[in-house]
């Protein structure tokens, strides 16, 4: 069957993030940085509250398939502190920025997307955002690649998180292709499960030496290998 669309996960697939997948140990440093920047007085009890709310929405600790907005999360955080809700947007921005330092787009990402695009194959993304991270931040990380991407899409847009196949199903409708005519490329088990749940061809990008068997149709070490798969 001819491949008509390729969908990419973002983190650790198109973009390298040097931070751990579980941010829990960095909650306090992130908010200490925010407090220092804005001269806020956050008490120990408030730091505990902040950590508890963030842990509640940490999908590495508490997986969920229904997405939750950033405003919901940060309203809950600030409501348990002395910080005015007027700071909500500023604190969201600084919190997300704390975790987005030193990111790097993988060196073969642009050339791979360009080659796929030259074959008249549609390109999209499907990424689970962290803590409801707004698309204005999440998609900023792939800004140099956006010229190749027909539909930049995240769990914010879908309303669902992986391994639910709903996001891929929505993308297939938007692209007017069958899910079976799509390839989904990701680096985690949930990416492969998402593809399987949607009836999409799955490609695991595995840059480690460790063998990973998640039920994927294909496994690659570098993005440029994808070109040979789509034919």
Where are these regions (language model features)?
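Asp-based, Mg2+/Mn2+-dependent phosphohydrolase catalytic module
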Residues: 1-6, 17-18, 36, 41-45, ...
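N-terminal helical cap/lid subdomain that shapes the substrate entry/recognition surface
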Residues: 2-106
